[in-house]
């Protein structure tokens, strides 16, 4: 179960990182 949670957490982080990069680029 822990592995599944880690995978989900990693996916969420990956989705969040690109979103932040896009927002930062848009602001710049």
Swiss-Prot record:
Activity across pH: Optimum pH is 7.0. Stable between pH 6.5 and 9.5.
Name of the protein in its database record: 3,4-dihydroxybenzoate decarboxylase
Keywords: Decarboxylase, Lyase
Regulation: Inhibited by oxygen. Completely inhibited by HgCl(2). Partially inhibited by ZnSO(4), 2,3,4-trihydroxybeonzoate and 3,4,5-trihydroxybeonzoate. Unaffected by KCl, MnCl(2) or EDTA. Not stimulated by thiamine phosphate, pyridoxal 5'-phosphate or biotin. Not inhibited by hydroxylamine, NaBH(4) or avidin.
Thermal dependence summary for this entry: Optimum temperature is 50 degrees Celsius. Stable between 11 and 50 degrees Celsius. At 55 degrees Celsius the half life is 1.5 hours.
Organism: Sedimentibacter hydroxybenzoicus
A GO molecular-function annotation: protocatechuate decarboxylase activity
Catalytic activity: 3,4-dihydroxybenzoate + H(+) = catechol + CO2
Enzyme Commission number(s) from the entry: 4.1.1.63
Subunit description: Homopentamer.
UniProt function note: Reversibly catalyzes the decarboxylation of 3,4-dihydroxybenzoate to catechol. Inactive toward 4-hydroxybenzoate and other benzoate derivatives.
Domain of life, per lineage: Bacteria
Enzyme class: lyase
């Amino acid at each position: 179960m822990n592995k599944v949670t880690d995978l989900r957490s990693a996916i969420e982080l990956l989705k969040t990182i690109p979103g932040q990069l896009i927002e930062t680029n848009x602001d710049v």
